[in-house]
A protein has these predicted regions:
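Substrate-binding pocket helix/loop in short-chain dehydrogenase/reductase
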Residues: 98-100, 107-109
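Catalytic loop of short-chain dehydrogenase/reductase
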Residues: 134-149
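Conserved glycine-rich Rossmann-like NAD(P)H-binding loop of the short-chain dehydrogenase/reductase
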Residues: 30-45
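The beta1-alpha1 cofactor-binding region of Rossmann-like NAD(H)/NADP(H)-dependent oxidoreductases
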Residues: 62-72, 105
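Conserved NAD(P)H cofactor-binding loop of Rossmann-fold oxidoreductase domains
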Residues: 90-97
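A short, exposed helix-loop element centered on a Lys and neighboring polar residues
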Residues: 123-124
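Conserved glycine-rich cofactor-binding loop
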Residues: 14-17
Length: 149
């Protein structure tokens, strides 16, 4: 795709499955989607579905906790398109459903890294790309607020 596109750009983090994939497919009807996720195979399957429906996507297989990679992606988006119209943030780490006292240190660390730290780092990276007209949509764990025991 050329650097000039008639379609607005939508960045979808966590695009490989679930809500992220569903949002990427829905947005691809009216946007050029930049799909970010760790799982390359799932991103390629998403791209196949988007293309089959007549849409276009740019795949960015990376982990949002990799600050350097996300900074480079944002620079590349700026250099190629100048801005994004929409950011859908659906990348979350949902630890196994368990009482908090039983949560492993590894799951805790991964949850904080993905759900808090990476999100906090991405906001100032993406705010200039969104400008005053862009919109951001954040999704959280679908089990938030439920009692697990």
């Amino acid at each position: 795709m050329d650097s000039i596109t008639p379609l607005p750009i939508a960045l979808v983090t966590g695009a490989s499955r679930g809500r992220g994939a569903a949002m990427a497919e829905a947005l691809a009807k009216t946007h050029h989607v930049v799909a970010v996720a760790r799982t390359t195979g799932a991103l390629e399957e998403l791209d196949d579905r988007i293309q089959a429906a007549g849409g276009q996507a740019t795949l960015a297989p990376m982990d949002i906790t990799n600050t350097g990679a996300m900074a480079q992606l944002c620079r590349s988006i700026h250099d190629r398109w100048g801005a994004i119209a929409t950011w859908v943030h659906a990348a979350v780490h949902a630890a196994p459903l368990t009482p908090a006292a039983h949560l492993s240190e590894g799951d805790w660390t991964k949850s904080v890294a993905c759900n808090v730290t990476a999100t906090g780092i991405l906001i100032p990276f993406l705010t200039p790309l969104l400008g005053t007209e862009g919109r951001a949509v954040f999704f959280d764990d679908p089990h938030a607020g439920e009692i697990f025991f």
